[in-house]
């Protein structure tokens, strides 16, 4: 992967001229990731999913562990990018202070300078209670009429407000237990 990114970086610099420059970043914004996958399919490319993500790994792959994700978003690779290299570290639940400290050390060691921890939150559609855990029932009123908050491209948003393709993608995401 580093070889490919290095090649892209080389040609971006080589063909840069006044009024024309090229950029390489991981940024399929909410609708762009869906549109690019659709356009690639229409152009005959093999597209395994309906939505591209801004990561160097498949978000639903349970075999890519948290430490590897920090490596993949570390200096070795992002030094070839000109922007948009955020890691959304999807976790099943909040960590202890010591566990967060350990991951911050990993991020520093790997040179992963742009990341956030992403833990789904539960929103009760009946009483409005928000819980910082992924729950099946509201702890305040007992309702099962729930929605969830997670990151779509960097900010927390109700999953029900994602585009349809992003809702499908969000349902496939793997949230690691640390």
Q: What do these predicted regions represent?
A:
Residues 1-178:
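Long, C-terminal-biased catalytic regions of enzyme "large/alpha" subunits
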């Amino acid at each position: 992967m580093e070889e490919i990114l290095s090649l892209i970086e080389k040609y971006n610099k080589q063909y840069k001229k006044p009024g024309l420059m090229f950029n390489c970043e991981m940024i399929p914004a909410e609708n762009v990731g869906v549109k690019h996958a659709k356009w690639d399919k229409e152009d005959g490319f093999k597209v395994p999913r309906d939505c591209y993500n801004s990561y160097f790994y498949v978000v639903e792959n349970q075999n890519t562990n948290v430490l590897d994700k920090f490596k993949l978003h570390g200096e070795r690779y992002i030094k070839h990018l000109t922007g948009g290299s955020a890691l959304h570290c999807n976790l099943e639940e909040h960590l202890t202070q010591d566990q967060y400290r350990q991951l911050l050390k990993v991020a520093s060691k790997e040179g992963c300078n742009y990341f956030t921890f992403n833990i789904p939150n539960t929103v009760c559609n009946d009483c409005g209670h928000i819980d910082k855990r992924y729950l099946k029932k509201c702890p305040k009123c007992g309702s099962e009429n729930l929605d969830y908050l997670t990151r779509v491209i960097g900010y927390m948003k109700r999953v029900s407000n994602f585009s349809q393709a992003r809702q499908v993608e969000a349902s496939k995401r793997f949230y690691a237990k640390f």
